[in-house]
Amino acid sequence: MPDATLSNTSLGRLAWLWLTVLIVAVDQVSKYYFENALSLYQQIIVIPDYFSWTLAYNTGAAFSFLADGAGWQRWLFALIAVVVSAVLVVWLKRLGRDDTWLAIALALVLGGALGNLYDRVVLGHVIDFILVHWQNRWYFPAFNVADSAITVGAIMLALDMFKSKKTGETVND
């Protein structure tokens, strides 16, 4: 019977991949629901003047960056997502036992990246359905669960970096 301590050490923090799988699952189920419940650009007001459900397709990156490209951007962003995902898995595996905050952050970013990667490769676009706005004057670009996970994970990574600098901790390589 293998030693449980050795097993945990060799896996590093890969046990946090369950969070990645959960993010991908919630992301894909929510996208499937809204794609089947709404027509393109239809809005359902949830909180008047602030929050709506909608259906939008994004062929670009964040904020529709390069969305008007001829299709090459699909594969560029897919390649970037694959490389970033591989780096995140290696980073996650190398984390120490006490790096729970960082492990959660990496798992969130990885889940978001994989959720949007699936859309980009299989559908040719990313499905967005969350629309935050202020009256009819200001609209934040539509986004999805994967985008939210990436954002929360990135904020957690930034906070971890500032905490490490402030306390003089060494940053894990």
UniProtKB/Swiss-Prot annotation:
UniProt superkingdom: Bacteria
Pathways per UniProt: Protein modification; lipoprotein biosynthesis (signal peptide cleavage)
Localization of this protein: Cell inner membrane
Molecular functions (GO terms): aspartic-type endopeptidase activity
Major location category of this protein: membrane
Record function comment: This protein specifically catalyzes the removal of signal peptides from prolipoproteins.
Protein name: Lipoprotein signal peptidase
The gene coding this protein: lspA
